[in-house]
């Protein structure tokens, strides 16, 4: 039987474990306040639903979008970065629309990582930061992130200790 080496390298999915614990507690009748996956707990606002319904009726929208996302959306993204962070970005080469953050990070990892490339990832972290680079055949190096450790010192130390130098550093806030 063939092995699936990339899948076997994946750590347990912590959000799946938390969900199982939550479901078990609810089955026992416990009252759970869920601070988990960020699923909405309120309905989508009516004006958004109305606009989506309106857009779904336009025949021009009955096709696949361009692969990088609609230009006006990419322009809005780069304008937002300029307004909020005073960063100039080119909507044609430095902005892309993805289905969501997980998909974007996973595809980024596949695009920039070669087998054996090392990647610095904070721990704890959002699971996709680890999963994406393992699935891209990279080597994940965990950098401690806690009140007891200066993260940037730990990051610099991890960078200096590894050769060849890590190709990617995940910085998330």
Where are the predicted features?
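Glycine-rich, N-terminal phosphate-binding loop of Rossmann-like dinucleotide-binding domains
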Residues: 99, 108, 123, 172-173
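A short helix-loop-beta submotif of the ANL/AMP-binding
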Residues: 134-140
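Short beta-strands and strand-loop turn motifs
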Residues: 33-36, 142-144, 168-173
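Structural signature of beta-strand start/N-cap positions in the alpha/beta core
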Residues: 31, 118, 139, 165-167
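Conserved PLP-anchoring active-site segment centered on the Schiff-base-forming lysine
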Residues: 111-133
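N-terminal small-domain helix-loop-helix segment of the aminotransferase-like
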Residues: 2-4, 8-99, 107
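Short beta->alpha connector loops at strand-helix junctions that form conserved
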Residues: 123, 142-147
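Active-site phosphate-binding strand-loop segment of PLP-dependent enzymes
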Residues: 147-173
């Amino acid at each position: 039987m063939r092995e699936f080496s990339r899948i076997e390298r994946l750590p347990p999915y912590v959000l799946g474990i938390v969900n199982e614990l939550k479901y078990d507690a609810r089955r026992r009748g416990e009252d759970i306040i869920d601070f988990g996956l960020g699923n909405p707990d309120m309905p989508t606002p009516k004006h958004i639903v109305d606009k989506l319904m309106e857009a779904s009726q336009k025949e021009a929208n009955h096709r696949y979008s361009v692969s990088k996302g609609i230009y006006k959306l990419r322009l809005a993204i780069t304008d937002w970065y300029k307004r909020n962070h005073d960063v100039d970005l080119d909507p044609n080469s430095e902005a892309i629309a993805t289905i969501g953050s997980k998909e974007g990070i996973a595809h980024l990892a596949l695009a920039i990582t070669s087998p054996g490339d090392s990647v610095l990832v904070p721990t704890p972290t959002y699971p996709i930061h680890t999963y994406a680079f393992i699935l891209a055949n990279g080597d994940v190096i965990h950098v401690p992130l806690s009140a007891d450790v200066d993260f940037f010192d730990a990051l610099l130390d991890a960078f200096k200790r590894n050769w060849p130098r890590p190709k990617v550093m995940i910085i998330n806030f």
